[in-house]
Every structure is written in C-alpha cells, then in structure tokens.
Amino acid sequence: MKIEALSLAEMRTHRSEKWRGFPSDVLPLFVAEMDFPVAKPIQDILIEMVSHSDMGYLSSIPELGNAFAGFAKRRWNWDVIPEQVRLCTDVGVGMVEVLRVTTQPGDKVLINSPIYQNFYNWIKETKVELIDVPFKQEGLNWSLDFDAIEKVYAAGLKVHAICHPHNPLGRIFSREELTRIADLAKQYGVTVISDEIHAPLTFPGKEFLPFLAVSQHAAEVGICVTSASKAFNIAGLKSALIVSQSKEQHELLATMPISVHFRSSILGAFAAVEAFNKCDDWLDGALVTIESNAHYLKTLLDTQIPAAKYKIPECSYLAWVDVSALSLGDDPFQVFLDKGRVAFNAGKIYGPSANQFIRINLATSESVLAEAVNRMAKSL
C-alpha cells in the first residue's frame, strides 16, 4: 500500500532541521528525512514507553540483534549473527568509533567522491589521512576506478570507507564490484567499512548485496555500519548498528569503549526493534511512493527544464541532478535558493567534481515536487 506524505501545512509545524534550516518562504528538499508518517508499530512502542515513564538508561538489548538478523534474512538473504550486532548512537558515531579501532592517527583512509559529506568529517575527526579516488563519470553513469584504487591499496592503505548503497549517486554496487573490493582488501590487508544505511530503501526489482555477505574475503575484511533511521524516518531517536561477520572483526570491535553502546537512546533502540520486526509493509509502501516520485520528478524535469539531466536511482529518496547545462555559475544551489526560494543540497559538499549537481529529496508529495521544479524553472 502506497504511503501518502503529510501535508505541507503539517510538515511546517515540525521541529526538525528540514523545517528550521531555512526561512518559512523557502521550500526545503535538502536533508535526508521523509515527509511520511512514522509507521504505527514504531509510534505504538514510543507511546507505550513514554506513557509508562520507561525512559531510563539503556541496558543490553539482545532483541535488536535478533530483529536485525531477521530483517536482513528476509530482505537480503543475509545470515547475520545476532551476537555480532553492536549498538551505537548513529551511523556517524559508528563510523568514527570503528575508525578509532582500525586506525592510528596518520593512517590512510580511502573514499570515492562524490560521497555523503560527513565521510570527510568522520575522517577529520579521527585524525587520519584522507585519500580520494574519485568515481569515473561518463554522462550520468559513475564507476569505480579500480586501477587507481589498487595503487592506493598497494601504497599502504589502512581502511576503505564505502557508501553502499551510494549517497548521493543513488546506485548499488554490483556483486562484481564488491567482490573485487573484498579481494583487494584481503590481498593488501585493508579493512572495508561499509555504510549501508540506505540499504532497506532498495527499489523493487533491484538487488542489494550486503558487503559482508558477498564472499568469505568480504566477511573477513568488512565491518558494516547501518541503522533503521533512514528507512523508517526516525533519525532523531539516535540508534544505529555496527555489524561484523568474522570472529576476528568481532573481537576487534569488542575493544571499543563500552560507552559506545550506552550512549544510544533506549527509545531509539526499541523503536528499531519494532521497525525491523513489524514494519516491512510500511517500508514497502514507502518504496512505492518514493519510486513513483523518482519517475514523476524525471517527467517534471524533462518537461520544464530539459537541460537538467537526471537518472532514476536504484535506491533511496535522493535524486542526483546534473544542472551543468543551465549555466548557473559555481553554485547552482545558491541560485535556486536566492531566486526560487527552494533549498536542495549543493553538489559541491559531496566532492570537488560535483559542484554542478544538486541533490533533491524525493520523500515528499507530488505537489511539493511539482512546486519545487516550478521554482527551479522560475530561477532560470
């Protein structure tokens, strides 16, 4: 069943960053949160816990490992070991804490730009050296430069941090790509940290393969960081997962401070249990809406701004739009904001090669998307 977005009037009463980040005359389609109502099982557990004043300190929560393992098996046929699912505050904290146990200051960490902007912040926070091997771009298609990647691996790389599925490109790495990364990592002694927060948002008919499930090598070299937050629209509840498949990685993660677990939210942890156990139907409905919106945005752009180029993503609710042909200068985001009063994400925050792109949030209503494109057109 299709999930209907809340009205714009309702959304403007919300207190999150999306609705407080810009003046009220700006239409916001930037930060990755949805305009959809939270699934009822999640609402129910939160109401139950709050109404019973059940908001104390978080203890152990084996329910979460079991819930994620069940979800991973249903959605991706991944055999997760529940005891090797660890809790953390959010994916950003998870990435930082994993970097802290897999690197020393000055070690080299590889990313592939354009990439979610906080990868740069996480690497800076842990005082390691950023190495960037950008994607190769051919039109609207992006591919990994494996020759350059192997050279970096061979030169003494410690960690390769990947975003799978990819934000902002909206693509899912293939089995062949993931296998090659895993084989190279095994050969050169590199740890692969895979941010898989967008994985539950894979579109029907597309295949997501968890990195740790791709091969024995992947299980040995990989660590996954993920959360229910993106797919179930509960980012403010602060709960995420760090998952390992091998005994060695599990033992390494056990050296993290115990506080990594206890800094998480008890409400967020139990909301995630409900999300993974009881919200498949809601998620499927959200995906129907998001994929429909992805096609609707393409129709709007093709009709009103045909020079803007956009490829339907394979996952998630983030559209990656090439506006280079519109001649908007070095910062198209600012032109749309100043002239159209519509806020997207500026491509330049994802990497130096992406300044002529914008990222548009699709998890809204058709009417909001139509108004956004109308404001874009009026900016030209």
Q: What is each stretch, according to the model?
A:
Residues 45, 216, 220-291, 299, ...:
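Conserved core segment of the aminotransferase class I/II
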Residues 136-206:
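Active-site phosphate-binding strand-loop segment of PLP-dependent enzymes
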